[in-house]
């Protein structure tokens, strides 16, 4: 079965960790993961400058490792990312910013990628959002 995930929550939330565990489990069961779309506060997953304590699980890094092992898309909503200071080199140039901080395992893109994930997946599972 082909899945896509929609993550609304920041890396520090239980909902985000549950999304990662779900992705890891479905891949272990030989299902396919088409795309993980990070929306609203989920955009914070894209920050490459986030520092996690030595005794904490680095969820953003873990997504990158899982993505490299299983070759699926990790997409940060561009509007949510820009609003939260997550920016790639292209957008840094566009907005005259001297730096960028998007993780190299992720991409910034619009809601069309979420619509595409809905069309190309058999299931879209959402994690986080209101009332986490």
Each language-model region and where it sits:
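Hydrophobic anchor at the start of a short beta-strand
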Residues: 3, 33-34, 74
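Short, glycine-rich nucleotide/cofactor-binding loops
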Residues: 3-17, 46-51
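Histidine-anchored nucleotide/phosphate-binding helix
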Residues: 15-36
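Flexible, charged surface loops at secondary-structure boundaries
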Residues: 30, 68-69, 116-120
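Short connector loops at secondary-structure junctions
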Residues: 37-46
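A glycine-rich helix N-cap at a beta->alpha junction
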Residues: 52-81
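N-terminal glycine-rich phosphate/adenylate-binding segment common to multiple enzyme folds
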Residues: 78-132
């Amino acid at each position: 079965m082909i899945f896509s995930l929609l993550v609304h929550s920041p890396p520090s939330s239980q909902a985000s960790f549950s999304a990662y565990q779900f992705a890891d489990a479905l891949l272990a069961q030989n299902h396919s993961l088409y795309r993980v779309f990070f929306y609203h506060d989920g955009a914070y997953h894209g920050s490459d400058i986030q520092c996690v304590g030595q005794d904490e699980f680095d969820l953003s890094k873990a997504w990158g490792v899982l993505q490299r092992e299983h070759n699926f898309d990790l997409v940060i909503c561009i509007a949510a990312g820009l609003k939260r200071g997550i920016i790639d080199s292209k957008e840094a140039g566009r907005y005259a910013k001297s730096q960028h901080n998007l993780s190299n395992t992720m991409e910034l893109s619009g809601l069309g990628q979420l619509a595409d994930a809905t069309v190309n997946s058999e299931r879209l599972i959402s994690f986080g959002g209101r009332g986490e």
